Swiss-Prot record:
Belongs to the PanD family. It is found in: Cytoplasm. Heterooctamer of four alpha and four beta subunits. This is Aspartate 1-decarboxylase. HAMAP family: PanD. The gene is panD.
Length: 126
């Protein structure tokens, strides 16, 4: 059996640009991509915390240290500057591999400052 698992997650990054006329993609500060193990041109899913929109695109490297999160092309209609996003990448692996897999999760402050990194998401309490 093959399972699709969370590979990397950027939690609550803020959109710094939205460029409708760029050819598509989401530009992400290279430091952020490294923190979550996201590669350039990798497929990503984006969840907009502010408006509930969910969409897929691909990552492109933004300038390292710039804190850029630029939603480009048609997806720019789904996110505005200042919106909070969760950006995820996924990986497929065997059931056996999945049972010991840990994602790379990066948590951010309101100004796109990396606050902490983790290899698990805390258990949600009732």
């Amino acid at each position: 059996m093959i399972r699709t698992m969370l590979q990397g997650k950027l939690h609550r990054v803020k959109v710094t640009q939205a460029d409708l006329h760029y050819e598509g993609s989401c530009a992400i500060d290279q430091d952020f991509m490294d923190a979550a193990g996201i590669l350039e041109y990798e497929a990503i899913d984006i969840y907009n915390v502010d408006n509930g929109q969910r969409f897929s695109t691909y990552a492109i490297a933004g300038e390292r240290g710039s804190r850029i999160i630029s939603v480009n092309g048609a997806a720019a209609r789904l996110a505005c500057v200042g919106d909070k996003l969760i950006i995820c990448s996924y990986v497929q692996m065997s059931d056996e591999q999945a049972r010991s897999h840990n994602p790379k999760v990066a948590y951010f402050s309101g100004d796109n400052e990396l606050q902490r990194q983790a290899k698990a998401i805390p258990v949600q309490v009732a």
